[in-house]
Amino acid sequence: MEKNREIISKNNINVQVFLVRSLIGKLNKKVKVLKALGLNKIGDKKVHFLNESIKGMLNETINMILLSEVNNV
């Protein structure tokens, strides 16, 4: 989980967001944030450019996702 925090602290990079936990039983706010990121079910992956709004969304759902840097998109 510490690696996620290190990636979020960087600026202007592309990150791949991977959903590793289920949405069942989660707060409606977190479910809406994940759907806005394009993650609907376990195993979904999306690439996002890391800006301030995406950082806030990732911080809100940090315990349900896995992040990795992407060099070329």
Curated annotation (Swiss-Prot):
GO terms for cellular component: large ribosomal subunit. GO terms for molecular function: structural constituent of ribosome. One of its GO terms (biological process) is translation. Keywords: Ribonucleoprotein, Ribosomal protein. Belongs to the universal ribosomal protein uL30 family. Part of the 50S ribosomal subunit. This is Large ribosomal subunit protein uL30. The lineage of its organism: Bacteria, Pseudomonadati, Spirochaetota, Spirochaetia, Spirochaetales. The gene is rpmD.
